[in-house]
Regions:
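Extracytosolic ligand-binding ectodomains
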Residues: 1-169
Length: 169
């Protein structure tokens, strides 16, 4: 994307703005300057003014620092207004709801996320157990499950629920 016109948009939260700021910093260090840098409010629903600004700037790539709800709305409204810029984001959009909200326009979205643990052979039994309860273990579900298992093992080993003892184990 070195020669692309890139917008960096964020949701003004510590996560979203932090992600956007670090992405902007990394781009700028490589000589890539964003054409739009802007924050939006979480809970906002109408991004038509933002999309108009992106279109006027000729944006080809939108980097989104934020979560799936606003990200989905932004990509839907971009497509509705004829802006076919590539959407790129971090793990905050790692949810089936992003696609539900964003619609078919999310096709081709690029995102960063650690490897999907659902495909690992040692996760097969846990994935099957979640699915048997009609739960799709998406995004961080299995990482969270593994963290709880580690805490449980430490509590069992120390025969204590004292957080300090569990943490020291």
């Amino acid at each position: 994307f070195k020669d692309a016109k890139i917008a960096v948009i964020h949701d003004k939260t510590p996560y979203g703005q932090g992600l956007a700021d670090e992405t902007k910093k990394a781009m700028n260090a490589k000589g890539i300057k964003e054409v739009v840098y802007e924050g939006v409010n979480t809970g906002e629903k109408d991004f038509s003014a933002l999309v108009s600004k992106l279109k006027a700037a000729g944006v080809e790539v939108v980097y989104w620092g934020g979560l799936h709800t606003e990200g989905g709305l932004i990509v839907r409204q971009m497509r509705d207004q004829g802006l076919n810029a590539v959407m790129m984001s971090g793990d905050g959009i790692t949810s089936a709801e992003f696609a539900t909200i964003g619609g078919p326009g999310v096709e081709g979205t690029l995102m960063t996320f650690p490897p999907d643990p659902r495909g690992r052979p040692e996760a097969a039994k846990v994935v099957a157990a979640f699915k048997a309860k009609k739960i799709d273990p998406e995004s961080y579900t299995l990482y969270s499950y593994a963290a709880v298992e580690v805490i449980k093992q430490a509590a069992d080993a120390t025969k204590s629920l004292d957080p300090k003892k569990v943490a020291e184990h």
